[in-house]
Amino acid sequence: MKKQIISLGALAVASSLFTWDNKADAIVTKDYSKESRVNENSKYGTLISDWYLKGRLTSLESQFINALDILETYHYGEKEYKDAKDKLMTRILGEDQYLLERKKVQYEEYKKLYQKYKEENPTSKGLKLKTFDQYTIEDLTMREYNELTESLKSAVKDFEKDVEKIENQHHDLKPFTDEMEEKATSRVDDLANKAYSVYFAFVRDTQHKTEALELKAKVDLVLGDEDKPHRISNERIEKEMIKDLESIIEDFFIETGLNKPGNITSYDSSKHHYKNHSEGFEALVKETREAVANADESWKTKTVKKYGESETKSPVVKEENKVEDPQSPKFDNQQEVKTTAGKAEETTQPVAQPLVKIPQGTITGEIVKGPEYPTMENKTLQGEIVQGPDFPTMEQSGPSLSDNYTQPTTPNPILEGLEGSSSKLEIKPQGTESTLKGIQGESSDIEVKPQATETTEASQYGPRPQFNKTPKYVKYRDAGTGIREYNDGTFGYEARPRFNKPSETNAYNVTTNQDGTVSYGARPTQNKASETNAYNVTTHANGQVSYGARPTQKKPSETNAYNVTTHANGQVSYGARPTYNKPSETNAYNVTTHGNGQVSYGARPTYKKPSKTNAYNVTTHANGQVSYGARPTQNKPSETNAYNVTTHANGQVSYGARPTQNKPSETNAYNVTTHGNGQVSYGARPTYNKPSKTNAYNVTTHADGTATYGPRVTK
């Protein structure tokens, strides 16, 4: 527990040194390129197309982030997990550096092309050279992508196997069930609330205010951030938290010289909130102070940790030439952590040892210019810190990860009392390591410095920073993978849609169906003309697809201006085109329009081409005729549907007469007669005793349903 709290600054470094958007300072490290599992020859394979590359890079980026998130899990901070975490981190850094090297090569080529362009176009001002962090990888082969993906997957699986072995050997690291975790959390919260009761009782007391503020700060460090508290997920974490909280309470009473009561009432916000339940709050303060006043010294023989005897309380020696960690809170006077009473005094009382020990002579050195191309490993904090170049890291669409350590997330509130005997309290924001201030005059700040407890390479992984962008919304969602990218650079995942979810087509024309299967539409054609296939599906120039109308069903027949009639059953019949006394004319497709408006169709020009069957099983014969085969049935038996259409085992289709089912001939409302053999004959359209009528195109419909065409109207 404590080893994680005091090394937050060190743990942040590994997260901030990510390849694709590296604007942070880097630490000089070893070369991880040999750790990559990508074959050297894979870069010579087939390149991923430009329109598909961005989505693959996004998917690959999310894999890196997920792997890092595993390392930042709170309960993996125990020393038993160190080797497994180092192994996984090495693989992550190896694959990350492979991408960095590829990007460096491509960027150098890009600069040469830009220089050549400027020489050929010296007056051009519109095109500017991109910096390295603005430049994105433009060439990646499918083999490289697949090998990177598989490498990260196998690394995570190996880590999970190592974790399982570790937890089998150390039973106190076995994860709690949900019920066990809830009970453990309740026990820890109860003890923390007792500490808060002591804090509220003495924070307005001028004599003991500094110790009360320090008590609150230590409790907050143990519990974690208010918006992301530490999970009590196993037995060891629970025991360490309870021990830490008990020792924090004991430290308060030893440093103040007060006696610890045998029982302290726990703070309950539903009863003791200083604003909403001020009477209950004052009653709790009074009860706690009275319990402390009436307590004896018997508690000193039952302390959680051993306290050494000393005649003088010596303050901690101030450190020189510290390099301030980006996660450490900033204070007015840079005071040391308060571990004893302010003044040295003669006493035989036990001296409280600091919960958070400040390392002597930690991070030192000077800031210098970094190398041209940095690597990514957090080698050690005991060395020279150099300024890294502007090569970008993984976070393409958001700020550098290191930026977040200068702006901590919203902390737990600290209750700051007003001067004198006033009972009003004010809640003010507090940093992760807590800024503890007096009210007026003298400063009693408490600075909790991070400490590097491990100096081996790639062994420190801190909690991932929380982005400070608001509001949070989904920037992009991939329907094929279910991955959501948020505006703050984080990612979310969901299961493939199945069953009651509708089909969904993403920007790449990939459709995820209800059953979770995926179908792929045509790739965008880019500047190709729109094309409609035999199924009335049109692929447009931008790659989008539109579908023709379904049968209208139960709608009345309708004839448009071109004499094309859509019947109630969805069928379409074509009337003669108005000829207006024009002679017969045959167009380029061998379709002849006669003088009476009738149309006859000749064979399509064959141009001596052989028969050809396209991907939709539509065959164009040598004489220009077209036959439509069914979709291949793949060795299925012959099958006849309700319309008497038989699909044979070889995929061919034969059409029988429409079944008449021994019904007599029948004429419908449109004067269309279906005979007993299934044939259909068409009578004249019913006129309903209407007189002859001539429309705007000089076409006259007579009482018997026939039509005559007059000359075109000349204007």
From Swiss-Prot:
Residues 495-710 are annotated as: 8 X 27 AA tandem repeats of A-R-P-[RT]-[FQY]-[NK]-K-[PA]-S-[EK]-T-N-A-Y-N-V-T-T-[NH]-[QAG]-[DN]-G-[TQ]-[VA]-[ST]-Y-G. Residues 431-443 have a biased composition (Polar residues). GO terms for molecular function: peptidase activator activity. Coiled coil: none annotated. Keywords: Prothrombin activator, Repeat, Signal. Belongs to the staphylocoagulase family. This is Staphylocoagulase.
